[in-house]
Amino acid sequence: MKEKNYGILNFNFIDNIIKKKRSEMLNILNKNIKDNDIESFLDIGTTEENELESSNYFVKNFDKIKIKNSISDQEIKKDNFNKFLRKSITSEFSETEILNYKSDLVISSATIEHVGSYENQIKMLENIIKLTNKYFFITTPNRFFPIDFHTKLPVIHMLPKKIHRKILRLINLNEYAEEENLNLLDENTVNKLINSQQNVSFEIRIFKVKLFGLTSNLLIYGEKIK
């Protein structure tokens, strides 16, 4: 889904903030993984938008990894990848697809809030675990941060979801009013997602990124238990 500038804040200002926060997320990831452990990288939810500095940020900043693959339901620029599978991460994956795309490091940046229902979000996490050899890293904005960086609007996304979606329809933001396009997560929901994964051989933790002293982003980090 391409981001549109509906809100009260300057678009370039927003992109600079997003880039800065993604740089902080990358630092958190680098502190937890062992670089010499990583031979292959899989990006989940690669976007067709690639011109903004914040777009596909992690792909652009893992230059040392030779094998880079992508799974996305968008038609993307494939130059950065060895292999590309056009498919939704909430779909069923065959054994062959898992074998072909399973990677040491799997990253999904700001995608899980766009896959639809809570059940779809669970399915996405399940598939990422299946596709991961060593580490996975999922980032998402925090629903209870006062500004929604999708619509660039303040506060209304913190209301109950039914009310939030009614308001979005009233102001003609119909695309974002559909659950299949935007279903924001908070820390409790992220914890529920993690707890839904029983008997997996991963240690899964939550990290938080802050902006103006408040949690702006939630990071799900998984590491294979040796």
What are these regions (language model features)?
Residues 39-145, 221-224:
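Conserved SAM-binding loop
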Residues 71-73, 198-209:
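Low-complexity, intrinsically disordered Gly/Pro/Thr-rich segments
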Residues 1-36:
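Class I SAM-dependent methyltransferase Rossmann-like catalytic core
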Residues 135-163:
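Conserved class I S-adenosyl-L-methionine
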Residues 150-154, 161-180:
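Short, glycine-/aromatic-enriched active-site segment of Class I SAM-dependent methyltransferases
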Residues 177-198:
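Short alpha-helix
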Residues 203-226:
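Core SAM-dependent methyltransferase catalytic element
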Residues 10-16, 89, 110-119, 176-181:
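Surface-exposed cleft-lining segments at the edges of enzyme active sites
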